[in-house]
Amino acid sequence: MQFTKIDINNWTRKEYFDHYFGNTPCTYSMTVKLDISKLKKDGKKLYPTLLYGVTTIINRHEEFRTALDENGQVGVFSEMLPCYTVFHKETETFSSIWTEFTADYTEFLQNYQKDIDAFGERMGMSAKPNPPENTFPVSMIPWTSFEGFNLNLKKGYDYLLPIFTFGKYYEEGGKYYIPLSIQVHHAVCDGFHVCRFLDELQDLLNK
């Protein structure tokens, strides 16, 4: 993993970054429903397949890998890894696990299952220790569907990476859908970029 610093003065987004990070800090969220009928038909495991899909598209586009380092310098990670939540029914709490990413779907599922087997029953917010800097958060709320979802973060204006939240899937008109909320920072990611991400994710889920 590499973190390549951005030359702000020669960056095509300098004006937008200065405005939405400094002058008028702005994050926003968008909630859509994804068609997962093909996943259901093929009998694929839902959660790891969604993690694979989201991470695949993130790694295609810099705007979803742009972050601040420990010194506040803007840069781009060469690769992102998913850091996702698992639920503990007995305590009604959750833990976070991160998994190494590979473009090979079968290999990623194996990595995911190894981490679930090793850390899935561990309590505490971070079940798998030492998450690397190049992780992004994903969570699942499988008990309800939703048409809108928003996170209110006290220090959210300094967080540039995307945040993903899935809901409960449902059947409608003979197809299966799942809600997805994506929260981004306007300083690095515009509506165009979010819509392109969602289009590419849906295309991937259709394959």
Curated annotation (Swiss-Prot):
Name any Gene Ontology BP term: response to antibiotic
The UniProt keywords, alphabetically, are: Acyltransferase, Antibiotic resistance, Plasmid, Transferase
Which Gene Ontology MF annotations are present? chloramphenicol O-acetyltransferase activity
Catalyzed reaction equations? chloramphenicol + acetyl-CoA = chloramphenicol 3-acetate + CoA
The active site of this protein is located at H186
Pfam families named among the record's database cross-references: CAT (PF00302)
Q: What SMART domains does the record tag this protein with?
A: CAT
Origin: domain of life: Bacteria
The record's listing under SUPFAM superfamilies reads: CoA-dependent acyltransferases
At the top of the EC hierarchy, this enzyme's class is transferase
Q: Which residues form a coiled coil?
A: none
Gene3D superfamilies of this UniProt entry? Chloramphenicol acetyltransferase-like domain
EC number per UniProt: 2.3.1.28
Family (UniProt) = Belongs to the chloramphenicol acetyltransferase family.
Functional description taken from the UniProt entry: This enzyme is an effector of chloramphenicol resistance in bacteria.
Subunit organization: Homotrimer.
This chain belongs to the protein called: Chloramphenicol acetyltransferase
Question: From what organism does this protein derive?
Answer: Campylobacter coli
Taxonomically, what lineage is the organism?
A: Bacteria, Pseudomonadati, Campylobacterota, Epsilonproteobacteria, Campylobacterales
